[in-house]
Design a protein with these regions (language model features):
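Short, flexible helix-loop junctions that flank or precede catalytic/ligand sites
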Residues: 1-262
Length: 262
């Protein structure tokens, strides 16, 4: 800063945590078994998206005989070959950009592709194409909530392409997982809260028909299918004593409704 060297550090454990250690819902973990499609993990910077994805990729590595390619900036967790073969590439070191790396990856017959972040139109468009052509693609966005995530993707495209993109998303999207890390009640760390949207026929229909405003209520009524809203998850954490009332309200999407349910 101002002529002096500066650095930003993030502590990353070298051991990849298991999904149950992170509290990742089982319905989310099982998405690694999909043969094709797009799975998005969303949330603000520092919400644990990379760790969640590393844990799911590790689960796939342990259980599938697949070819997995990860494109990251930077590489945070090292995946060793287990049942699968895992190739990891770092933007800036091994490739110029996510879009370049993704195009190259498609020529290598991968089963699963992790794209560290969908930053621009070219990367998003190529990721959608990859999911359409028989690959399972995992990626992240800095959005909160399924509806805003879908809107964000569609808004990146020129107006004349948006309806076609909406139809493509309705076909290929398998899940949107939004997460936040909330300080625990005992002050000894943070606990993850998740919103889970899975691509049921009802959800696919809402995306296709441009009724994103109805997605939240559909998630609320689909808990038996493994879906849950972020606020319902936060409320469960509060009721189980994992987080304080104040923290529940700070992270709630709808504070008025949260207070009533408390």
């Amino acid at each position: 800063d101002r002529g002096n060297m500066a650095a930003a550090y993030r502590k990353v454990d070298t051991i990849i945590p298991r999904p149950d250690q992170l509290g990742i819902p089982e319905a989310v973990v099982q998405l690694y078994k999909k043969k094709r499609g797009l799975v998005l993990v969303t949330g603000p910077t520092g919400s644990g998206k990379s760790t969640t994805l590393a844990s799911i990729i590790n689960k796939a590595n342990e259980n599938l005989t697949d070819h997995i390619i990860t494109l990251e900036d930077p590489i945070e967790y090292i995946h060793k070959h287990k049942k699968s073969v895992v190739n990891q590439r770092e933007v800036g070191m091994d490739t110029l950009s996510y879009a370049n790396a993704l195009r190259a990856a498609l020529r290598e017959d991968p089963d699963i592709i992790l794209v560290g972040e969908m930053r621009d139109l070219e990367t998003i468009s190529t990721a959608i194409t990859a999911a359409e052509t028989g690959h399972l693609v995992f990626s992240t966005l800095h959005t909160i909530g399924a509806a805003s995530t879908i809107d964000r993707i569609i808004d990146v495209f020129p107006t004349h392409q948006q309806q076609q993109t909406r139809i493509q998303l309705a076909m290929i999207l398998e899940g949107v997982i939004s997460q936040a890390l909330i300080p625990t009640a005992d002050g000894n760390g943070r606990v993850a809260a998740f919103e889970v949207m899975l691509a049921s026929p009802a959800i696919r229909s809402l995306i296709r028909e441009q009724k994103n405003h109805q997605i939240q209520s559909t998630i609320q009524t689909s808990r038996a299918q493994g879906m849950i809203t972020l606020d319902d998850y936060i409320l469960d954490l509060y009721k189980s004593g994992r987080i304080t009332r104040d923290m529940a309200l700070v992270y709630a999407q709808d504070q008025v409704a949260m207070k009533k349910q408390m």
